[in-house]
Amino acid sequence: MTFRNCVAVDLGASSGRVMLARYERECRSLTLREIHRFNNGLHSQNGYVTWDVDSLESAIRLGLNKVCEEGIRIDSIGIDTWGVDFVLLDQQGQRVGLPVAYRDSRTNGLMAQAQQQLGKRDIYQRSGIQFLPFNTLYQLRALTEQQPELIPHIAHALLMPDYFSYRLTGKMNWEYTNATTTQLVNINSDDWDESLLAWSGANKAWFGRPTHPGNVIGHWICPQGNEIPVVAVASHDTASAVIASPLNGSRAAYLSSGTWSLMGFESQTPFTNDTALAANITNEGGAEGRYRVLKNIMGLWLLQRVLQEQQINDLPALISATQALPACRFIINPNDDRFINPETMCSEIQAACRETAQPIPESDAELARCIFDSLALLYADVLHELAQLRGEDFSQLYIVGGGCQNTLLNQLCADACGIRVIAGPVEASTLGNIGIQLMTLDELNNVDDFRQVVSTTANLTTFTPNPDSEIAHYVARIHSTRQTKELCA
């Protein structure tokens, strides 16, 4: 038997993990084992919301060392993280300033300023990326306006996964899928857009040309002295998750469900027309030249904050209590900027309901019900937008990532969208990370080949839409009201 041992470092906004994958060539089987899991979260430092990158690096090294201590020969390592955030380095490779997190308020007002000065359509035609107030484009503008004293010291700007790869290898890389999340990459050239960079205040010399997934960045020398290749995987965690989504046919959509929910479909060409701009659709880079045509949805961040504020440790019990409540009594827009990082999420949700003359969710279960119903309804709206954009309805939706374990939300999604939902795999980002490593090692041919492996090894659960559910009736009433308004307009 021929085995490959690949390590995936998968960092999310709330947790990180070092996972060992064992691939058996002859039977094309893939197994995952968790080596080390650790917390991640926001910190307050010198008036900024930041990431503790030193702690994350220590956790990564601890996980890698654990694998080596077991005497396992590692064939390759790959790192994926969330998008848009970056670390600044000087000429000696030392950090400049703080690793500020995207939920910091320093970018307030800058997106509107960019649209006014550069033109919303021009920015979109150049980048193909949706407008989010924390995109790297606006973060860099905030940095250069608010901390000009740092600029003379900056030699390099590395996005998060590239920074951690650099810390392991001493080699710098700017991986393409994550680079596209910055809103600074030109969608036609796949290189940094000089006009957008100029507006941001950043120097183009801070960046190298983006590289596509599948190249070896450098090598990590393990404690035993072996040189282990560090591969540039699809380093945006959503890009990795999409690679591991067992999409079947052209009418399949995906939903990567975690702190963020990212709903979309794969395409060989981007969508940058006026319809896409009006819907704020993004065209992020994927593996093999594919585009991830999708929309960001605030996701389970709202629930994570409620769990933290209310000190709730038993999520299954909360979901059970939530399931017993009637649907659609409290509806909010999860994508409202007010929910990006409020002082207290519970109060913000209650205020949003109060301002729209709805009942106020008071109990933990009512707050969770509000979040789940609101997310499912937003999923339905976004899926409809995506279908209109491409001119064809979807026949099935694949939900991947940690959020796919929430069976209540999966069923609500199926009912609200009126579509069959297939949930799994849970560790999609990790698997997609491993998939690119196996392709780089010449064990697999391409993404479609890898998806066949995922389909046969992952635990997948199907949720059939129930047209008689409360949320399905609610959606039907909304559609009827919309059609009446359109006819009367």
From Swiss-Prot:
EC number(s) on file: 2.7.1.5
Entry annotation: catalytic residues: D237
Disulfide bonds: C68-C222, C353-C370, C413-C417
SUPFAM superfamilies: Actin-like ATPase domain
Binding of substrate, residues: G83, H236, D237, T238, N296
InterPro entries recorded: ATPase_NBD, FGGY_C, FGGY_N, Rhamnulokinase
Metabolic or biological pathway, per its Swiss-Prot or TrEMBL entry: Carbohydrate degradation; L-rhamnose degradation; glycerone phosphate from L-rhamnose: step 2/3
Superkingdom of the organism of origin: Bacteria
Cofactor(s) required, per the database record: Mg(2+)
GO molecular function, one term: rhamnulokinase activity
UniProt keywords, alphabetically: ATP-binding, Disulfide bond, Kinase, Magnesium, Nucleotide-binding, Rhamnose metabolism, Transferase
Reactions this protein catalyses: L-rhamnulose + ATP = L-rhamnulose 1-phosphate + ADP + H(+)
Record-linked CDD domains: ASKHA_NBD_FGGY_RhaB-like (cd07771)
CC terms in the record's Gene Ontology section: cytosol
One Gene Ontology biological process: glycerol metabolic process
Entry keyword annotation includes Transmembrane: no
Binding site for ATP: A13, S14, S15, G16, R17, T259, Q304, G402
Protein family according to the UniProt entry: Belongs to the rhamnulokinase family.
Record PANTHER family: L-RHAMNULOKINASE, SUGAR KINASE
Oligomeric and partner information: Monomer.
Known function: Involved in the catabolism of L-rhamnose (6-deoxy-L-mannose). Catalyzes the transfer of the gamma-phosphate group from ATP to the 1-hydroxyl group of L-rhamnulose to yield L-rhamnulose 1-phosphate.
Protein's UniProt name: Rhamnulokinase
